[in-house]
Amino acid sequence: MNIRNAQSENNPLKPTTSENAEFEVRSRSFFAFNTNCCIKAAIETDGVQSSSGQLLEKVLDDAVNLCFHYEKLWSHTREGSDIWRLNHAQGEAVPIDTETAKILQLSRHYREETAGLFDVSMAPVAELWNFRKGRVPSPGEVQLALKVARTGHPRIMEDHAQLPTAESRISLGGIAKGYIADRVVEALKSHRIHDALVNLGGNIVIMGRPFLAKIPQQQWNVGVRSPKHVLQRKEAEEQAAAIARSPHGTDPRALGNRKQPNEEPACILKLNDCSIVTSSIYERCFTDEHGNIHHHIVDPRTGRPSESDLASATVISKRSIDGDGFSTALLIMGSYWAKNYAEGHPDLEAVLITRDGRIETTSGIRKAIRAR
């Protein structure tokens, strides 16, 4: 997702302001959850020096530390985290934090709501399609991993959790950022910060007025990436890399003449006070020796990357965790099922982009969308 700035309309839950309001703005950029993150927050000023900046600095420091706290608690690759200990307990019960129990319960909820298309227990299968390894697993490897993953969801007690078998593993990578983004928003609001932009590696929450705007407007403009342009760019990068590896050497003119596609958003949404989360086939993928692209969104029914007609599924919701829990499932469903499914959930809106570039939307978001 790309954020473009505009001026939001007045929100009855917040103090009203003039269109020419001035803001004290602070931001924090950091690396967490294996991705780049950024939190920006603002306080309206009267154009004079105040202590607003000091408050923003402290609030943002606390927000970043909150993110690091959850990463330490839930990273499946971090030795000693609740999830690491659970995955290495050989099927034995392990003590866990109360919030770990909570997010595991929420994971079970989304698993049930999506008929198993969102499932944290699919970690053994997802690991086979690791885009960093760039290796296509054999059918036998996939079936064995599926057998392990299908043994079931963790058993959750008040302060303990237990995986069904010694080989079982889970990962909260598909839901943790949504949960954490919601906690960050709560923390900001507790300090009476009502204007903010939270971006946890693509889990985006917009709060209040778009304080970064140079020209006052009424709403945030949120750009949805075009899968076609991203895939074209990746293809160009692969071709350039192949030339560089050629035993005949690299012809600088050939690389220089390769024009990168102009990456314009597929559409722009005019929004206020919501979460925007996208699942896509183009962000984490690799190309095999035959030129086939394999992405990281695994269909639990097959153990292979989703083969639906969708290239991306964007969920607009009040809670970021809903965006996490449903966007992956919608992408796997395909455009027809996903659109009808989202229409049946009043708390969700969706923008679905097919592999050939067609845009489908739910009825509630149509007035907010502007195609490019």
Spans of model-derived segments:
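Mature catalytic core of soluble alpha/beta enzymes
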Residues: 1-372
